[in-house]
Every structure is written in structure tokens, then in C-alpha cells.
Amino acid sequence: MAAETVELHKLKLAELKQECLARGLETKGIKQDLINRLQAYLEDHAEEEANEEDVLGDETEEEEPKPIELPVKEEEPPEKAVDMASEKKVVKITSGIPQTERMQKRAERFNVPVSLESKKAARAARFGISSVPTKGLSSDTKPMVNLDKLKERAQRFGLNVSSISRKSEDDEKLKKRKERFGIVTSSAGTGTTEDTEAKKRKRAERFGIA
């Protein structure tokens, strides 16, 4: 403000009047009156400008954009690594399947008939059982069990062994003899009838059977 008063004092009367006209002030009076009017006007307007600047400053502060906070993504668990590990485990398990079981599955996939022996071998390999043919064993053990039961029943009730038990014993002996000499056909039974008759007599004498 001191600089403005100095400048006003330097102005001439005509220049002061022009300043007053420009600001809508009266031009009447001496030079000092014009200077006082201009100073009062400038002081009033200086306060208004200061207030406007303060208001504008507040508005600009309010209008300052706030920093946008980006959402922080949570770290997801490594699912891919787990999937890869499970796939590897599955591959290892499938590689340990026995060859017989794989052949059976392949035959089922392509609708190819699978033999009974291969099925048995696959089942035995699956459960860890040795695949030994049990046809001969089952056929040989059945008559023995039946004979023992018949003998026990006959001894329990004090009865003689029936002709059925004798026939089964003879059949069993014939079968064993055929297996011993490698005879397969049933025609060899005629040549061994004498031996069986002699054995029948000896057995009857031993057990006191009439």
C-alpha cells in the first residue's frame, strides 16, 4: 500500500482524475482529495480481493482429488501346484497295474472276449494269490470227503457201508491208477476189474463186511 500511495502522489491532477473516472469516483476537489479517494477505494478493493483469494483457496483445497486406494488382492493358494502333484501321483499308481489286469481292461474297452484263464490270472494278481489250477484237486477231494462221511455215518449207526460208497471207492482207485500210468480213456477200466474185485474182498474181510 505504501508503494501505491507514492505512485498516486507522483501522478498529476489530470491523471488522478482519469483514475477516479475509471473507478467511478468523483473528480471534484483538489489533488489531495483525489489521492485520498483513490487510496480509500484501493484499500477497500484490496480487502475484497484478499477475501476472494481466501475463498478460492478453500475451494481449491476442497476440490483436490483424493488418492484412489486400489483394492489389495489377497494371495491365492497355489492350486496349480497341488493339481500337478495329484496328477503325478495318479500316473504312478496306474503304472503299477499288473499286465494281466491291463489286458483285461483293454479287452473290455474294445469288446474282445477274455478267456477264463486270463480272468483268473488277473484276479489272482490283484489279490496276491498264486494262480494254480485247482481242477484236479477239487475233483479228487470231493469223493474222499464223501467216503469219510459215509464211513462215519455207518460206524455211528452200526450199519454196513452201502454199495454207493464201494462204487465211489472203486472209481477213486481207478482214477488214481489212470493218473499214475497216464491213462486218459475210460476203456482201461475193463482191464483192472480183477484187481478191484480182489481189493473189495480184502476190504470186506478187514472190516468184517458180509
UniProtKB/Swiss-Prot annotation:
SUPFAM superfamilies, per database record? SAP domain (SSF68906)
Residue numbers of N-acetylalanine PTMs: A2
SMART domains in alphabetical order: SAP
- For the SAP domain, which residue ranges apply? 8-42
Q: Where is the composition biased (Basic and acidic residues)?
A: 65-87
Listed A to Z, the keywords are: Acetylation, DNA-binding, mRNA transport, Nucleus, Phosphoprotein, RNA-binding, Transcription, Transcription regulation, Translation regulation, Transport
Cellular location(s): Nucleus; Nucleus speckle
Task: Provide the GO MF annotations for this entry.
Answer: chromatin binding; DNA binding; RNA binding
Look up keyword Transport and say if it applies: yes
**Domain of life, per the record?**
Eukaryota
Has the keyword Transferase been applied to this entry?
no
Give the modified residues of type Phosphoserine: S163
Region described as Disordered: spans on this chain: 45-87, 162-210
Q: Might you report a single GO cellular component term? A: cytoplasmic ribonucleoprotein granule
User: What processes in GO biological process is this protein linked to?
Assistant: mRNA export from nucleus; negative regulation of transcription by RNA polymerase II; regulation of translation
Q: Which PROSITE patterns match?
A: SAP (PS50800)
A Pfam family it matches: SAP
In-chain residues carrying the UniProt-annotated modification N6-acetyllysine: K10, K142
What are the Polar residues biased-composition ranges?
184-193
Q: Where is the composition biased (Acidic residues)?
A: 45-64
Q: Which family does it belong to?
A: Belongs to the SAP domain-containing ribonucleoprotein family.
Q: What does this protein do?
A: Binds both single-stranded and double-stranded DNA with higher affinity for the single-stranded form. Specifically binds to scaffold/matrix attachment region DNA. Also binds single-stranded RNA. Enhances RNA unwinding activity of DDX39A. May participate in important transcriptional or translational control of cell growth, metabolism and carcinogenesis. Component of the TREX complex which is thought to couple mRNA transcription, processing and nuclear export, and specifically associates with spliced mRNA and not with unspliced pre-mRNA.
Q: What is this protein called?
A: SAP domain-containing ribonucleoprotein
Lineage, opening ranks = Eukaryota, Metazoa, Chordata, Craniata, Vertebrata
